């Protein structure tokens, strides 16, 4: 599809390379959504960091597990709650502590979407169609996370197939026609409900892609910072 078919006003904001990208958190200059579709609120002392980065010359976000988290708002178009099409949710995480509380919530939206690490460092994912604990998808401890190491996590829906990938390798997959719902609950990075099960570590390149299953088989994780 051609983006320009006649004279036009040049872009006045940063470009998003892929139109299906609905959210991209890439904290080079600030903690903001590079797709410019959502707003991000920082809680505690969540901040950018160069202590641990996935790619040289970039920045990550550090959450220390004591009140730090990010909350994404105005996500009507960017989040995939109730969405029946393909989607991809992915990010890099560098966990630094395996015993911070009972669980560590990596990315959540109410009860309906929870990507988390168990006390035994097991990567888990639950999805609910009515934002309750009645889950149609329950991937429990499908992979043992490695502490102090960057790992690429991806949740993909391709048709009716849901797959959880770690570092480009499928760790769990199931077929379901159900669609998850997080109701009106906000999307949060590094916590559940604003106070529960905080995650500790560094985060980078959180991207939400709507209308496209970026990964449909095992793949090589991104080798450079995401730009779109």
Go through each PLM region and give its residues.
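Localized edge beta-strand/strand-to-loop motifs within extracellular or lumenal beta-rich domains
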Residues: 149-163
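Extracellular beta-rich ligand/substrate-recognition surface
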Residues: 60-70, 127-136
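Extended recognition patches within non-cytosolic domains
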Residues: 1-39, 43, 48-59, 100-101, ...
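Extracellular glycan-interaction patches encoded by glycine-rich segments
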Residues: 74-76, 128-134, 140, 182-204
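Beta-strand-rich interaction surfaces with strong enrichment in secreted/lumenal proteins
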Residues: 76-78, 140-144, 176-177
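Extracellular glycan-recognition modules
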Residues: 3-5, 66-127, 147, 161-162, ...
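Solvent-exposed strand-to-loop "edge" motifs in beta-rich extracellular domains
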Residues: 27-30, 92-98, 155-158
């Amino acid at each position: 599809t051609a983006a320009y078919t006649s004279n036009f006003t040049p872009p006045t904001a940063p470009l998003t390379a892929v139109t299906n990208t609905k959210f991209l958190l890439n904290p080079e200059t600030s903690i903001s959504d590079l797709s410019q579709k959502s707003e991000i609120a920082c809680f505690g002392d969540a901040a950018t960091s160069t202590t641990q980065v996935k790619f040289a010359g970039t920045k990550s976000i550090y959450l220390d597990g004591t009140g730090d988290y990010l909350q994404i708002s105005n996500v009507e178009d960017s989040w995939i709650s109730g969405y029946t099409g393909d989607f991809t949710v992915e990010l890099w995480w560098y966990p630094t502590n395996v015993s911070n509380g009972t669980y560590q919530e990596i990315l959540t939206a109410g009860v309906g979407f929870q990507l988390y690490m168990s006390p035994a460092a097991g990567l888990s994912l639950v999805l609910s169609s009515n934002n309750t604990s009645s889950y149609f998808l329950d991937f429990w401890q499908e992979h043992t996370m490695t502490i102090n190491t960057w790992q690429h996590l991806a949740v993909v829906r391709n048709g009716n197939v849901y797959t959880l990938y770690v570092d480009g390798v499928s760790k769990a997959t199931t077929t379901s026609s159900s669609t998850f719902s997080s109701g009106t609950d906000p999307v949060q990075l590094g916590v559940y409900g604003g106070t529960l099960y905080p995650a500790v570590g560094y985060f980078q390149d959180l991207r939400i892609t709507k209308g496209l299953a970026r990964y449909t088989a095992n793949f090589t994780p991104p080798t450079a910072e995401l730009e779109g």
